[in-house]
Amino acid sequence: EAAVDRLAMLYQQATNALRSALKQYLKDRTPPSAAHCAFRYPELRLTYHCQGEVPSSVRAYAKVQVPGTYAVTVTQPDAFRTYLLDQLRPLMSDFTVTVEVGPSQANIPYPYVVEQGDELGASGVTAAELARVFPSTDLSAANDGTADGLYDWEDQDPLPLALFDAARTDFSLRRLVHYTGSDWRHVQPWILLTNYHRYVDQFIRHGLNMLQADSRFLQGNSPSEGITLVNIGVGPSNAKNITDHLAVLRPHCWLMIGHCGGLRQSQTIGDYVLAHAYMRRDGILDRVLPPNIP
């Protein structure tokens, strides 16, 4: 917990300093001094000193494969606190590791600390001018190289500690706000994806019934463990875009219900149904998944 607490403290200090400097610049065009422009993401660094131990757990998460140093930049550590603790506790318990927390070399882009864009629009300062004074968004840094395995284990130092670093996460969090019109924190850890309007309508009706005053659902469930329903009937490219952004939230599970999720009139529950896999001709995933895989 001390490591996560320090991540939160460093992140808060950096974002507060960036907001303060940005506010001052909008007021009187005073740029931040060199001593006050270290607006950096915190970094979580873990060194694995292999002592020959063989962890008994067969879990697919919270484990390291080879001795060495692993690192990742972190954003919004308070919001991701539970996730971070769930990963770090078993790592520190089952492996001989050293955990360090400190500022990284990656700057926080100024758009990621501005909650409302109106204050920028009313200031008369252009985005191009702000980008010359403050760290700005670098889309080349927000990539899926780690998640897609597009890196060399032998030459990478440090090794990636997580699938998504701070730049990639912040980019997707802002996209979720843009696409949904609501806070990204509203997305629940259980996600249901579908491209059929009738499924959406049915789940909405079911959800409204569950929210009735006398519902057993409300009596036995925590408000933080809900379901988010996403209609992805917007084409394969947009559907991939949606899931790319949702992935940084590290949901417990997501499930897609397409055409094969429904029963025909001639079928009953218990019948064996073979789902059809389509041969991909859209080219959306060809870069990360061989085209011969359905």
Residue ranges of each PLM-predicted region?
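Accessory terminal and edge-of-domain segments that mediate assembly/interaction
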Residues: 1-253, 262-294
